[in-house]
Amino acid sequence: MSWAPVSTWSRRTPLAACCSAPELPPAGAWKACAAGSLRIGPQGRCKMMKNWGMIGGIAAALAAGIYVLWGPISDRKKYRKGLVPGLLNLGNTCFMNSLLQGLASCPSFIRWLADFTSKYRQENNTTEHQHLSVTLLHLLKALCNQEGTEDEVLDASPLLEVLRAHRWQISSFEEQDAHELFHVLTSSLEDERDRRPHVTHLFDLDSLEFPLEPQRQIHCRTQVPIYPIPSQWKSQHPFHGRLTSNMVCKHCQHQSPMRYDTFDSLSLSIPVATWGHPITLDQCLQHFISTESVKDVVCENCTKIHAAQIPNSQSVENRKTTFVKQLKLGKLPQCLCIHLQRLSWSNQGSPLKRNEHVQFSEFLAMDRFKYRISGCSTSKQPANHLSAAEQETTDGKEGGAQNPTMPFLNGACSTSYISPPFTSPLPTNPEWTSSSYLFRLMAVVVHHGDMHSGHFVTYRRSPAAKNQKLTSQQWLWISDDTVRRTNFQEVLSSSAYLLFYERIQSNLHHPEDQRAAEK
């Protein structure tokens, strides 16, 4: 034969050459080749056919690999349009993945993180990779297609490493609770905020010229005044709110001083369902702020009244009466996280999960649960400003009473009263349009399983396009690294565990006005 065997050629030729035809012999050698092949016999011809089959198989495999790596990119981009990346499950980290997808659906929280990191990450001594706010911001922006990545699945293990640096022992191989992780994140962000410098920057001329509390100046050893930083309330995260606690004596109607407590999420118990009637989110909120009687509370006013009725020589004991206590929402956050308590206990002390469906809606009016000061006007206010009840600390009355004739009350309605989510970016229901504290649903976290094991998934809105300011009406179902489109009716029929709402301005109906309200 006039050329090397195919097997020898294939060993000496580069791998890329396998995709092209082998070098052909001179024209005069064809006859000798044919004669030689006839002399080889059946076994030789079979061997040559196997060699040619091997070359064809290698070429086909390389062609398929090239197509997979470079060919379908445009198709994948077309398919991913409107979708978001999924998150890799690192063992049992579905609780973290579902929470991150829910947080990524809240634009106000991402904007706050961006502003927070730009102001304070240069003021701390820790390196940038140790900042929870920086790590969380990059991850949430990537989940909203704002980081320019083409990865369909992201790895959230850097977040676990940062939390461990904050001394949180979170294992990726043990099932955790998404609501508990939410409070771990918010408390760690507050710790990061509190570690910033406690004096005003020299280039902060406004704070130096007009200090908020000049009477509380701090003096160093040289007696040079160091002005305090502005109030930390200005840098609170968007989930931060305040509760008011009001107690009134049932005997003398004396009202104790108002107390304020902070919250990052509203943890609502699920009331017992009435036969034939569904449980609604409105009922859970009403149950949260319902009055309760507190017995054996010392009433200073009753003690004074009793002391005035007895001679001075006799000692006066503190009068204990029954007080009525009620909670109200003193400050509503920009982003509202609602936790539905699905843990209950059997008579034997075993944990049980409540699987009742709680009806919720796309829009949530919170005016009836808001604390208002006596004489405070109920006129509409912009969503990005605090009301007088949020700024004052004096006593006051309860919020507006519930109108029993309203057909819709935060989930207590039939589907005929639900505003179609695909036709209008803003609500058209009268209760919603007249609300001063209106919220829009952004994400729902659902837990499948029992109290001992299960899986978390998330329903969330698809991020709005870069050239579009209105909120997207496309909903997604996300389970770790699996992302698919879904419809809003599937979202409403889910058994919610965490609900993420974001405050909007209800009395505006034009896109230009909504863009101004969202700034």
From Swiss-Prot:
Subcellular location(s) of the protein: Mitochondrion outer membrane
Domain USP residues, every copy: 85-504
Entry annotated with the keyword Ribonucleoprotein: no
Annotated catalysed reactions: Thiol-dependent hydrolysis of ester, thioester, amide, peptide and isopeptide bonds formed by the C-terminal Gly of ubiquitin (a 76-residue protein attached to proteins as an intracellular targeting signal)
UniProt keyword terms in alphabetical order: Hydrolase, Membrane, Mitochondrion, Mitochondrion outer membrane, Protease, Thiol protease, Transmembrane, Transmembrane helix, Ubl conjugation pathway
Residue span of region Disordered: 379-405
E.C. number(s) listed in UniProt: 3.4.19.12
MF-aspect GO terms: cysteine-type deubiquitinase activity; cysteine-type endopeptidase activity
Mitochondrial intermembrane side: 1-52
GO cellular component, one term: mitochondrial outer membrane
Its job: Deubiquitinating enzyme that acts as a key inhibitor of mitophagy by counteracting the action of parkin (PRKN).
PANTHER family: UBIQUITIN CARBOXYL-TERMINAL HYDROLASE, UBIQUITIN CARBOXYL-TERMINAL HYDROLASE 30
The name this protein goes by in its record: Ubiquitin carboxyl-terminal hydrolase 30
Organism of origin: Xenopus tropicalis (Western clawed frog)
Gene for this chain: usp30
